[in-house]
């Protein structure tokens, strides 16, 4: 691998509240793609505008990061709802961010569902299909960030939606290739995370929670900005990759 996307979730505060270490401004110049919170799990109109402006300043590609309607739970609680309701909620959020992007003369590069909604679409064939079918009608060239092997990935391939496969630097994997979902993420060692990412890029392997090596293929590395010590994780990972001759570059 000679180049890889490095993405992070941005703008995940709300009004006067900040999620994580409040280091968006320091992380933004280090990443190539930003997933911007669109108001349902986090974010508000003012934070969306500020985050788009910050991404534009640093030449970072932007994407919508729609979540469940769950500000209290930060979008990490599953909400049982019909597929059409979930897709309508995602379209609403996508449209909101698109206008702030247009204000800066930008287009959205991608969409990446957040948290529990991301995992719901990864498992629910009906919701994933309706979402991808809707994207095909609305914006068939919009990149869809997803987990390899998920329902989103399978249906996206089937219908021809362009996909970006993700590798999670700050999450554990199990032997099935799924990320181990958690509501509380512990602090991680930046050098260990950088080593994990470099090995995945060079060898296409990651160590699972069962202690086994798992083959992994991906186009983008995700480090969540709300993970404790996120700035150090992003900085160490970028430095390690660039030191190994791997360029950090957005998919488009």
From Swiss-Prot:
Keyword flag ATP-binding: yes
Entries under Gene3D superfamilies matching the protein: Glycoside hydrolase/deacetylase
Record GO terms (molecular function): 5-oxoprolinase (ATP-hydrolyzing) activity; ATP binding
Reaction catalyzed: 5-oxo-L-proline + ATP + 2 H2O = L-glutamate + ADP + phosphate + H(+)
SUPFAM superfamilies: Glycoside hydrolase/deacetylase
GO biological process: carbohydrate metabolic process
Family matches, as InterPro entries: Glyco_hydro/deAcase_b/a-brl (IPR011330), LamB/YcsF/PxpA-like (IPR005501)
Alphabetical list of Pfam families matching this protein: LamB_YcsF
UniProt-listed Enzyme Commission number(s): 3.5.2.9
Keyword vocabulary terms for this entry: ATP-binding, Hydrolase, Nucleotide-binding
Keyword Cell membrane annotated: no
Source superkingdom: Bacteria
Described purpose of this protein according to its UniProt entry: Catalyzes the cleavage of 5-oxoproline to form L-glutamate coupled to the hydrolysis of ATP to ADP and inorganic phosphate.
Family under the similarity heading: Belongs to the LamB/PxpA family.
Assembly, per entry: Forms a complex composed of PxpA, PxpB and PxpC.
Protein name: 5-oxoprolinase subunit A 1
Species of provenance: Pseudomonas aeruginosa (strain ATCC 15692 / DSM 22644 / CIP 104116 / JCM 14847 / LMG 12228 / 1C / PRS 101 / PAO1)
Gene name, Swiss-Prot/TrEMBL: pxpA1
